[in-house]
């Protein structure tokens, strides 16, 4: 049986294998399994910022400085829409 914890772990392993070393989290109850799994995996430098818009722009700046991808992760619902301005700015 596949659990939420297993799915989170497998997802983060794939992200690590793709070369992502930084994740910026905007925490919420729905993405808690990803935060817990990322910490347990130990493959990432993690930052937690409660404001999604600030988190996305922080990730964009970090990506520009390091010239490497930075993952962003938020809870479900409209929280994702707050990432949109930084995503647009990235392109």
Task: Enumerate the predicted regions with their spans.
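Thiamine diphosphate
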Residues: 1-81
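Hydrophobic or amphipathic alpha-helical targeting/insertion segments
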Residues: 88-91
């Amino acid at each position: 049986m596949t659990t939420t914890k297993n799915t989170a772990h497998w997802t983060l392993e794939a992200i690590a294998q793709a070369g992502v070393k930084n994740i910026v989290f905007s925490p919420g109850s729905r993405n808690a399994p990803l935060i817990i799994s990322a910490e347990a995996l130990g493959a990432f430098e993690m930052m937690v910022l409660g404001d999604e818009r600030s988190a996305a722009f922080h990730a964009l700046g970090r990506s520009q400085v390091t010239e490497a991808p930075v993952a962003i992760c938020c809870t479900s619902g409209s929280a994702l829409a707050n990432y949109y301005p930084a995503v647009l700015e990235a392109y």
